[in-house]
Amino acid sequence: MIVRVDVLPIVPGTGRILVAEVIGGYHGQAQLGRFWLPSGLLAEGEQPGEAAVRIVRDQLGLALEGVVIVGTRQARVADAWHLALVVAGAVSGEPAPRHPVSGFAARTLGELPDQLGFWHRDDVAVLSSRYERLRA
């Protein structure tokens, strides 16, 4: 099983989520939309929170703090099962997007497109509110 970590980067005090802009799709998945939650694979021996910090640093150039696992989803992609762990946290710093991310957008839930990679906007709203409840 492949374990993917999708990160829900919360911009503290703004009610906004930072989404990655990936022109031409991500891993060849252009049909899944232009905006994605930053994501990557869980490395051998790595904890999900550590992976989330690494992914946000490597893809957006930002720090991620207060990480919490807020959701999971299993899906069959091609010939392999993927387990997606959604880890939320607060971002800080100046963004510096790196490949495969071509840009980013800080958006409120109402401003998000319907589809964020493998996640629908309604899923992201539930996960975001779960993060807020867990951090309270």
Predicted regions and their residues:
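Active-site-adjacent beta-strand/loop module that shapes the phosphate/pyrophosphate-binding cleft
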Residues: R73-P95, D123, R130
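Hydrophobic/anchoring residues in structured secondary elements
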Residues: I69-Q74, A106
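Nudix hydrolase/Nudix homology domain
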Residues: L32-G33, A96-A136
